UniProtKB/Swiss-Prot annotation:
Similarity annotation: Belongs to the YqgF nuclease family.
Name of this protein: Putative pre-16S rRNA nuclease
UniProt-listed Pfam families: RuvX
Top enzyme class: hydrolase
Organism, scientific name: Chlorobium chlorochromatii (strain CaD3)
Record localization: Cytoplasm
Record-linked CDD domains: YqgF
Superkingdom of origin organism: Bacteria
EC number: 3.1.-.-
Length: 140
């Protein structure tokens, strides 16, 4: 088992799943990319089997009042399926309210061109990185 393990963040969407991971020390978020549901299993399985992942953080859709949204039930089912597939892997949630909006603002501020911002998956990956960055900040 590796001395340092990573935290993986997931921004689950109906079309794509944005994925990010922490550095081995758990200080920074790094983008992995976007996958579909089957691709997520293929991505996570080798990392989990190698003992490289200590925790998965899933964006949880709450509105600005902290109440559940229409997507919350979908995320609950997704988390349950992750727990069945990876029973020993701890899974936590983090409020993802405005994560996509914040990710878009970050892409604009970083000088990412409009064409690059519209690239499929770019926003989902950025949102996963923001979720993970927020989670890591909360742990300090």
């Amino acid at each position: 088992m590796p001395l340092y393990q990573r935290i993986v963040a997931i921004d689950y969407g109906t079309k794509r799943i944005g994925v990010a991971k922490s550095d081995p020390l758990g200080m920074f978020a790094q983008p992995i990319g976007t996958v579909d549901r089957a691709g997520l299993s293929k991505l996570l399985s080798p990392m989990v089997e190698a003992g490289e992942v200590q925790l998965v953080v899933v964006g949880y859709p709450l509105n600005r009042h902290g109440e559940q949204t229409a997507m919350t039930e979908v995320i609950d089912r997704f988390i349950e399926s992750l727990r069945l597939e990876f029973p020993a892997l701890p899974i936590e949630t983090i409020n993802e309210h405005c994560s996509s909006k914040s990710a878009m603002q970050l892409l604009v501020a970083s000088g990412t061109s409009r064409k690059e911002r519209k690239t499929k998956g770019r926003l989902d990956t950025a949102a996963a990185c923001l979720l993970l960055s927020d989670y890591l900040e909360q742990q300090k």
